[in-house]
């Protein structure tokens, strides 16, 4: 179950011919209410795609009726014409739903710099609306894939309500948000203000800490829609926990499907002076090509970890840093620790723990190894 697990939502994914080979490439997620509270977070890349620019305006009043998504083209760096294409897409879906275009979020993913084939896209929107149903969540999740090899879906049951979600992303995964489109839905009764606060809290500790290749997309969008169809006003603490779990579940799936990856790496930074320091250190390690290559080669090279830590302005004393790789403390006090031969890097899941010995704050950042397959895939992405 996916975005249609909560009551009040319909979805569909169809093949409109934007991508080759008859693959699904247009999706809609429709909120049939009775409420339409919503919030969204977007890329912090200053080069924002046209659908991001449109959707930032659309979600500003906290009311969203539907989301339309396409894969096969990012509609980024396409100028005023690209923005008009995003507007036209919103207007087209709004007309089909007898609603207003300023209540439609538009998302696109794919190659940057090319206009979308609008006749195909609009025909796809019509087909998706016609097919939209309570069991359409899986097809919708399939339609937003680009280099993803599998669809990503998740849901959780709360006390009288449900939270569902879908996401896409396999490359350009880096804060803010990681390269992703994600639609989250709930049938809980929430205000727009609650949606905003809860979504930001969840993404801050999940999507924002997924960093596979240091490349921030132009199109990142995560939107939360609340239909209120369950009639349940949730306990905020419980809802926040479950929403974070859904986002974390999707993050794990994104990490598992990252382009060319053979290892899923959790970088746990503890003993930091602040959470910001912990995140900064985690990101520095996650983006260090030498470290990522070492993990690919199953080499527990803790020196590369320390070298990455040293590039940050986090508070620490080099002689107080400890590093463990898969539970073996290979570095103690900034120098040689336990026998690195004890480290088993055969499993796909790898945990690197860095103790800065500078405080009590902590954070985890997720990344992958750097592989030959990643280079091959991204050297031929547009050809």
Curated annotation (Swiss-Prot):
Gene Ontology CC: one annotated term: cytoplasm
Pathway given in the UniProt record: Amino-acid biosynthesis; L-arginine biosynthesis; L-ornithine and N-acetyl-L-glutamate from L-glutamate and N(2)-acetyl-L-ornithine (cyclic): step 1/1; Amino-acid biosynthesis; L-arginine biosynthesis; N(2)-acetyl-L-ornithine from L-glutamate: step 1/4
Membrane-crossing residue ranges in chain numbering: none
One annotated GO molecular function: glutamate N-acetyltransferase activity
Enzyme class: transferase
Involved in the stabilization of negative charge on the oxyanion by the formation of the oxyanion hole (site feature) positions: 109-110
Residues holding substrate: 146, 168, 179, 259, 378, 383
Keyword flag Transport: no
Superkingdom, natural source: Bacteria
Swiss-Prot/TrEMBL keywords: Acyltransferase, Amino-acid biosynthesis, Arginine biosynthesis, Autocatalytic cleavage, Cytoplasm, Multifunctional enzyme, Transferase
Active site: 179 (nucleophile)
EC number in record: 2.3.1.35, 2.3.1.1
Compartments, as annotated in UniProt: Cytoplasm
InterPro entries: Arg_biosynth_ArgJ, ArgJ-like_dom_sf, ArgJ_beta_C
Subunit structure: Heterotetramer of two alpha and two beta chains.
Function: Catalyzes two activities which are involved in the cyclic version of arginine biosynthesis: the synthesis of N-acetylglutamate from glutamate and acetyl-CoA as the acetyl donor, and of ornithine by transacetylation between N(2)-acetylornithine and glutamate.
UniProt similarity note: Belongs to the ArgJ family.
Protein name (Swiss-Prot/TrEMBL): Arginine biosynthesis bifunctional protein ArgJ
Biological source species: Thermobifida fusca (strain YX)
């Amino acid at each position: 179950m996916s975005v249609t697990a909560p009551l009040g939502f319909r979805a569909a994914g169809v093949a409109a011919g934007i991508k080759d080979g008859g693959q699904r490439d247009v999706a809609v997620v429709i909120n049939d209410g009775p409420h339409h509270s919503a919030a969204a977070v977007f890329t912090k890349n200053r080069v924002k795609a046209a659908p991001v620019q449109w959707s930032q305006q659309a979600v500003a009043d906290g009311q969203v009726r539907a989301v339309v998504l396409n894969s096969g083209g990012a509609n980024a760096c396409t100028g005023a014409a690209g923005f008009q294409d995003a507007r036209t897409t919103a207007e087209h879906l709004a007309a089909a739903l007898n609603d207003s275009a300023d209540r439609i979020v538009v998302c696109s993913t794919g190659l940057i710099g090319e206009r979308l084939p609008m006749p195909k896209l609009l025909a796809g929107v019509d087909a998706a609306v016609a097919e939209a149903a309570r069991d359409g969540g899986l097809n919708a999740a399939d339609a937003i894939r680009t280099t993803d090899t599998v669809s990503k879906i998740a849901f959780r049951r709360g006390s009288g309500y449900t939270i569902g979600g879908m996401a896409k992303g396999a490359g350009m995964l880096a804060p803010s948000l990681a390269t992703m489109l994600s639609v989250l839905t709930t049938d809980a009764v929430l205000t727009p203000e609650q949606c905003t606060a809860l979504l930001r809290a969840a993404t801050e500790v999940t999507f924002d800490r997924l960093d596979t290749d240091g490349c921030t997309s132009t199109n990142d969008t995560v939107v939360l829609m609340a239909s209120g169809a369950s009639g349940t006003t949730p306990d905020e603490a419980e809802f926040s926990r479950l929403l974070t779990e859904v986002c974390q579940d999707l993050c794990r799936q994104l990490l598992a499907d990252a382009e060319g990856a053979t290892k899923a790496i959790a970088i746990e930074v503890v003993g930091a002076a602040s959470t910001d320091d912990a995140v900064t250190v985690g990101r520095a390690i996650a983006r260090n090509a030498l470290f990522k290559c070492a993990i690919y080669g199953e080499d527990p090279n803790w020196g590369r970890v320390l070298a990455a830590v040293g590039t940050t302005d986090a508070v620490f004393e080099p002689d107080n840093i400890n590093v463990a790789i898969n539970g073996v403390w290979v570095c103690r006090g900034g120098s040689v620790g336990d026998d690195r031969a004890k480290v088993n890097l055969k499993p796909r899941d790898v945990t690197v723990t860095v103790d800065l010995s500078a405080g009590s704050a902590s954070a985890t950042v997720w990344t992958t190894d750097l592989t030959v397959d990643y280079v091959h895939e991204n050297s031929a992405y547009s050809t």
